[in-house]
Regions:
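Active-site acidic/histidine proton-transfer and metal-coordination neighborhood
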Residues: 18, 59-61, 75-166
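N-terminal small/glycine-rich loop or linker at the start of catalytic domains
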Residues: 1-6, 67-80
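A short beta-strand-loop structural module common to alpha/beta enzyme folds
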Residues: 29-41
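Short acidic, glycine/proline-enriched helix-loop-strand junctions
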Residues: 41-64, 139-141
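Histidine-acidic metal/acid-base catalytic patches
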Residues: 1-5, 13-29, 106, 151-274
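Charged helix-capping and loop-helix junction motifs
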Residues: 46-52, 88, 92-95, 122-130, ...
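Surface-exposed, active-site-proximal loop segments in enzymatic domains
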Residues: 38-48, 72-92, 116-124, 208-216, ...
Length: 274
């Protein structure tokens, strides 16, 4: 096993094949894709011509389409609703179409974010994750759960799903949402449970839900260096995917977003290859 370095599509001010191309020219190994509009645009990633363009671009620029993030499940809140309701059925449709897109684009990991606020929402999210696991097992796709919940609630979720999901470990979310310590979570999950990492950094003044502003890795208050050392100590090797927002302040104040991306790429590789 070795380390691989990726970037989230939404970290850039552009998307689709252009984002894939820029990731390739920057030197990344792969990319985590968004849904290209998902349900709101009738699932464009399931269109054969669009799939062909994505696959051809990824091959040409030697970019692995590492994962697909179903961000709309969280943004729309549909994952918090029970099945046989319009919202719950919409969540199931997003999951089904996400799995289909993964198969067509040779994507091996589907990322689902869960952050329920009530017991009912928690139960509904668990039901949708169980549904996702059933489909994923048939299609040989890994389900990776990202969550800003406190560690005990995430562990209950993992226990209920009986090892059928892994964790997309975001090293900033526990601080930004005030739900825990990323180092403690990494140590608790260990290498067997973590699918991949979202790498990002920010300022303490931006440690509030809803904030997206970031700073270059290692220049903020999120303890990037200490967290990276913890990742090494547990023996993790795999995908490190930057989720910094390279077009938003305070990082980008009328700067060249590609220069910022290249700086973080250099930081990532020097951190984990030294």
């Amino acid at each position: 096993m070795k380390n691989y370095y990726g970037i989230c599509e939404w970290s850039m001010p552009v998307s689709g094949p252009l984002a894939i191309r820029l990731a390739g020219t920057a030197g990344f190994d792969g990319m985590q894709l968004g849904e290209a509009g998902g349900r709101s645009l009738n699932f464009p990633l399931n269109h054969p011509e669009i799939q062909q363009i994505y696959n051809e671009t990824a091959r040409h620029y030697e970019i692995r389409l590492h994962s697909l993030n179903l961000g709309a499940l969280l943004a729309e809140g549909t994952i918090d609703f029970p099945v046989n309701t319009p919202q719950g059925d919409a969540a199931r449709a997003s999951i089904r179409n996400g799995i289909r897109a993964c198969r067509a684009l040779d994507i091996r990991t589907l990322v689902i974010t869960v952050s329920p606020k009530t017991e009912d929402a928690y139960s509904n999210a668990l039901s949708h994750l169980e549904y996702a696991c059933r489909l994923a097992e048939i299609s040989q796709v890994e389900i990776a759960v990202e969550s800003a919940l406190p560690l005990p609630l995430i562990q209950v979720l993992l226990d209920r799903l009986k090892g059928r999901v892994k964790v997309c470990m975001d090293i900033l979310n526990p601080l930004r949402f005030g739900t825990g310590d990323p180092i403690e979570q990494i140590q608790a999950f260990g290498t067997e449970t973590i699918s991949h990492f979202h790498m990002k950094d920010s300022l303490r003044s931006l440690f509030t839900p809803g904030q997206r502003g970031c700073v270059l890795l290692g220049t903020g208050d999120a303890g990037y260096i200490q967290t990276a050392e913890t990742i090494k100590k547990i023996g993790f090797q795999g995908w490190m995917i930057t989720e910094n927002y390279y077009y938003l302040p305070p990082m980008n104040m009328n700067d060249d977003f590609m220069k910022l991306i290249l700086k973080d790429f250099e930081t990532l590789t020097s951190t984990f290859e030294s």
